[in-house]
Amino acid sequence: MATLSPLLLAALLWVPVGTLTCYGDSGQPVDWFVVYKLPAHSSPGDVAQSGLRYKYLDEESGGWRDGAGSINSSTGALGRSLLPLYRNTSQLAFLLYNDQPPKYRGSQHSSNRGHTKGVLLLDQEGGFWLIHSVPNFPPPSSSAAYSWPPSARTYGQTLICVSFPLTQFLNISRQLTYTYPMVYDYKLEGDFARKFPYLEEVVKGHHVLQEPWNSSVTLTSKAGASFQSFAKCGNFGDDLYSGWLAEALGSNLQVQFWQRSAGILPSNCSGVQHVLDVTQIAFPGPAGPNFNATEDHSKWCVAPERPWTCVGDMNRNKREEHRGGGTLCAQLPALWKAFKPLVKAWEPCEKENRAFSPRSPAKD
């Protein structure tokens, strides 16, 4: 295999000074993107077998595209977006949180904290919020470079990155006081600490102590796209999807989540809106790929009749009814048209009405 010259590699990794934003697979700033890391055996090929293959989506991609190489690469959307973490961070603020953090500063898996994973990275003009499902990710800022954890290669994962102006981070930081994240690395100094007191509270491990136990806020991206953030704390005491989200969005939901944990909640059709557990995922085209939900650690849901799509960090199980976490939703046509066809089959309710056929393929 031919190697890249140092000059070419430097050009590929170049990030403009003062431009903290999500970067797409093409290397250009984007308002938002979604990366769907595929399960290791989802399709043939060396990259696929090693669990480093992914699909990429943004506003201009025209649907899902094959990722630009390996998800472990610093030149792809994830690596390029997170690159400032592993360079000079003197002018930045950041927060890395994960209920299963990398081994750093003695951090341990903490089941009393929120089941929530993400990155906030910002400068004086704005930055991005990355919400994901990946354990042990990303590496702390003291690491030599971006990398993908070997522990996250086997199963599917989802990550959504949205670029926001600085003004939106006050609402974002307040949402984190509900989700009670395990922060394993951060930098919050000077003006950032003064502008975002909620982030200081989050870093100290503080969280909401009185009702309401959930919060929904509208966030506006740098390009003006509208996102709805849903956050709950453990005292909410109910499933995020059937206990709140379906009613809030006014729609049935098909939910993909990790189905190898204990206490899985079955599909729920007790309310006006039905919440159905996805059992099979299939990407379009003859090459697929397609796989079972038991091979997929991602967390997302889609409304089959209305253009809502949400990507987050919570499962549907009994334990997580009593843990913090959330999801980020939008009515973006590009997002909905990409996610809706992924649902190949779902678990029906025991007495489900026939609006959805038992375990049947999704209808066009």
UniProtKB/Swiss-Prot annotation:
GO biological process terms on file: apoptotic DNA fragmentation
Cysteines engaged in disulfide bonds, as pairs: 22-161, 269-349, 310-329
Residues annotated as signal peptide: 1-21
TM stretches of this protein: none
First-listed, main subcellular location of the protein, grouped into a coarse class: other
Keywords assigned by UniProt, alphabetized: Apoptosis, Developmental protein, Disulfide bond, Endonuclease, Glycoprotein, Hydrolase, Lysosome, Nuclease, Signal
Keyword Hydrolase appears in the UniProt entry: yes
Family to which the UniProt record says this protein belongs: Belongs to the DNase II family.
Protein name listed in UniProt: Deoxyribonuclease-2-alpha
